[in-house]
Amino acid sequence: MASLRKTHPLLSIVNNALVDLPAPSNISVWWNFGSLLGLCLITQLITGLFLAMHYTSDISMAFSSVVHICRDVNFGWLIRSIHANGASFFFICIYMHIARGLYYGSYLYKETWNVGVVLLLLVMATAFVGYVLPWGQMSFWGATVITNLLSAVPYIGNALVQWIWGGFSVDNATLTRFFAFHFLLPFVIAAATMIHLLFLHETGSNNPAGLNSDADKISFHPYFSYKDLLGFIILLMALTSLALFSPNLLGDPDNFTPANPLVTPPHIKPEWYFLFAYAILRSIPNKLGGVLALLFSILVLMLVPILHTSKQRGLTFRPLTQLLFWALVADVLVLTWIGGMPVEHPFVIIGQVASALYFLLFLVLSPAASWLENKTLEWS
């Protein structure tokens, strides 16, 4: 008689996704980040739910309610600390996951990849509206600066900004709707994740060799379930260590000051995980141009499958494109550094060069290098 997990209408879905799923035998630790992202999402949902029970989305009480959570709620300080730092770990895992996809050519599963890019945009939107909720100085001014960018939209720009604000400035209506969005979006992310997995399981996983692995598959459980468990333990240990030992390491000191519309902080900057995009935005002197560059810095990922010119899938046996990949990694790190620096010489020119290189690597240099490698190997 067949096992219940194989015959039950609901359990069979779980079984086919987590137990009897055929997986390539040679997938490395870089394939762990998908499940780590699932863990991050669950952690954020649980801690966020408990925070929402005690948070008040009113400009006169928001900052005080966060203080109340940290001082008066049982383990409130820990829940908040895990939630705030969990966001950083979420983005570390996302960027690693995307880097893996770029390196090994996983983007050739176009549906999975495009849903992934949509997921990235959703997570970024969620993180942005979440950062506004404590209603500190950087929350308020970050919301003001970033929402103001929409005024660059031709003709309807100003109306659009006032519509999002719910008034003529970032005020109570803005905070209330941002809280609503911050509560709603993670559930949309969870649904999109299911679609992401659905498309992935249509094709099966890619592997480091970039070759068809149908001839050499092993079951997900116990092999990769235990491998993922190791990743879970490492991630949770790192997260709790950061949350317990230096919870404010990645935050901005300005956010310990309640929001004041009359005092502008000396340097308005987002959390570290948005700095690369913020640097690209600032490197273009024109407002609309900057906004388009900001948007395209993420949407360029959707062009990667279209611009894939190589006869090989991954970069495992392509030294020239490997060099460009690591140049891209270095470039993003430089942009992250520049995003946190004041707008003055030499940071402006470094940011402009790094921004130009970012788009060149995606749109020109990588496809050209792939074409050259094909020619060298006489595969064209």
Swiss-Prot record:
It is a multi-pass membrane protein. Heme b b562 binds at H83, H182. InterPro entries: Cyt_b/b6_C, Cyt_b/b6_C_sf, Cyt_b/b6_N, Cytb/b6-like_sf, Cytochrome_b, Cytochrome_b_C_euk/bac, Cytochrome_b_N_euk/bac, Di-haem_cyt_TM. GO terms for molecular function: metal ion binding; ubiquinol-cytochrome-c reductase activity. A ubiquinone binds at H201. Binds 2 heme b groups non-covalently. PROSITE patterns: CYTB_CTER, CYTB_NTER. It is found in: Mitochondrion inner membrane. The keyword Cell wall biogenesis/degradation does not apply. Keywords: Electron transport, Heme, Iron, Membrane, Metal-binding, Mitochondrion, Mitochondrion inner membrane, Respiratory chain, Transmembrane, Transmembrane helix, Transport, Ubiquinone. Heme b b566 binds at H97, H196. The keyword Transferase does not apply. Heme 1 (or BL or b562) is low-potential and absorbs at about 562 nm, and heme 2 (or BH or b566) is high-potential and absorbs at about 566 nm. Belongs to the cytochrome b family. This is Cytochrome b.
